[in-house]
Amino acid sequence: MPKIITTRYYEKKLNVFKPKHPELKEKYAKTIKLLQADPWHPSLRLHKLKGNLSDLYSISLNMKYRILLDFIIKDDQVFLIDIGDHDGMY
């Protein structure tokens, strides 16, 4: 089971995101729990990004919102980098 690590930037973005989207509170908690249990679960829609963000991966909160992350597979760690809407993050 990978260890979930949040960056300071991610925490700041999350503190802005959560109050704006209270309807996603349960979905967010479920997504993070699933990410920790099985990062490759199909419902997360995990995929590697391209272009300037090619070192990162993305998972879906829903069809509009994403969480950017970085895998350190060797150490079994997942770093949460950013959270926001699909268009604003890419």
Task: Name each model feature, range by range.
Residues 3, 12-17, 22, 61-90:
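Enriched for short, Lys/Arg-rich terminal
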Residues 6-7:
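PIN/NYN-family metal-dependent endoribonuclease catalytic core
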Residues 30, 51-54, 69-73:
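Short alpha-helical linear motifs
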Residues 32-35, 66:
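Hydrophobic alpha-helical segments with strong N-terminal bias
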Residues 22-25, 54:
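Short functional linear motifs
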Residues 34-59:
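A short, surface-exposed loop/turn module that caps and links secondary-structure elements
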